[in-house]
Amino acid sequence: MHSFASLLAYGLAAGATLASASPIEARDSCTFTTAAAAKAGKAKCSTITLDSIKVPAGTTLDLTGLTSGTKVIFEGTTTFDYEEWAGPLISMSGKDITVTGASGHLINCDGSRWWDGKGTSGKKKPKFFYAHGLDSSSITGLNIKNTPLMAFSVESDDITLTDITINNADGDSLGGHNTDAFDVGNSVGVNIIKPWVHNQDDCLAINSGENIWFTGGTCIGGHGLSIGSVGDRSNNVVKNVTIEHSTVSNSENAVRIKTISGATGSVSEITYSNIVMSGISDYGVVIQQDYEDGKPTGKPTNGVTITDVKLESVTGTVDSKATDIYLLCGSGSCSDWTWDDVKVTGGKKSSACKNYPSVASC
């Protein structure tokens, strides 16, 4: 028979065990109000709510190495103190991560503090969000305003970004530049669904990767839907890309593929489908193989092949001083193209097109 003392001791020990367990259980669902607390406590949480965090200057909101299956919720207004640095402002990695924005939330980067019209030159500006190694994961419903520079840098496998709003409209008059919305590289399986973007650079830029789908996009004020520049990276392959059911307005270009002069690589299995453009200032459709130091040279090379490219139902208007279609390929490097219902009007016809497949028109 147990003595009263031994039962009491057992009860106290059990209570101590429960007491020590309780904080761990409480951390299963965590609300953080500072970047430091989020970084320190993230590994112990299955659900992380980021409530109105003010991120200190020169600091990344560090959500890398999240436990598999973690849910992340942005709530309230997230802000960032000012410092000239490379960023990123937010970085996230892990597997099976679900990221959402609560109703009424805003991630306000207040990019005008950095904007000087010089983009990657001039002041050092932080990139916004690194989704590097954020595999088999999703980001849904984020509302983002005025990124200092590029918004999303995606280097992940099997990631889906849905209903993302990137509103850098203020940059049109306040010096926003190089504010790419989605830069994709070294990724297999990227889905970008129904984004709304107003920016001052590419709405989408794919530098390398495979199995990429972009659909339902609204792209305003930037440089259009781009593949490239391809070349001179560790990975110079872009394969199996579908860009469809999207509008591009008041932008420099609508549809663009560009490769680096003298580089090697490949661009293949590319489809642009049901793209509607308006108010395009430079080129409606542009495919060129002559980029060097970020600028076209007019002298295409053939080291990066562009094959199996399909344009279907690519329509709309460009400005009177713009060029409807410009195709500048290296010798033998552009082949196996399909064009169906490509109707771009309003601008000039180019006399400088070269080496493009006969099914295309220039």
UniProtKB/Swiss-Prot annotation:
Q: Where is the signal peptide?
A: 1-20
Q: Show the disulfide pairing.
A: 30-45, 203-219, 329-334, 353-362
Could you tell me the EC number(s) of this protein? Answer: 3.2.1.15
Provide one Gene Ontology biological process annotation. Answer: cell wall organization
PbH1 repeat ranges, renumbered to this chain:
156-186, 209-229, 238-259, 267-289, 301-322
Record's keyword terms, sorted = Cell wall biogenesis/degradation, Disulfide bond, Glycoprotein, Glycosidase, Hydrolase, Repeat, Secreted, Signal, Zymogen
- Record propeptide residues: 21-27
Residues glycosylated per entry:
240
Any one GO cellular component localisation term in the record: extracellular region
| Catalytic site positions | 201 (proton donor), 223
Q: Which reaction does it catalyse?
A: (1,4-alpha-D-galacturonosyl)n+m + H2O = (1,4-alpha-D-galacturonosyl)n + (1,4-alpha-D-galacturonosyl)m
Record-level Gene Ontology MF annotations: polygalacturonase activity
The answer to keyword Isomerase applying to this record is no
User: What InterPro entries has UniProt attached to this entry?
Assistant: Glyco_hydro_28, Glycosyl_hydrlase_28, PbH1, Pectin_lyas_fold, Pectin_lyase_fold/virulence
Locate the coiled-coil region(s) and give their ranges: none
Where, per UniProt, does this protein localize?
A: Secreted
Described purpose of this protein according to its UniProt entry = Involved in maceration and soft-rotting of plant tissue. Hydrolyzes the 1,4-alpha glycosidic bonds of de-esterified pectate in the smooth region of the plant cell wall.
Would you identify the family this protein belongs to, as annotated? Answer: Belongs to the glycosyl hydrolase 28 family.
Protein name in the entry:
Probable endopolygalacturonase II
Q: Which organism is it from?
A: Aspergillus kawachii (strain NBRC 4308) (White koji mold)
Q: Which gene encodes it?
A: pgaII
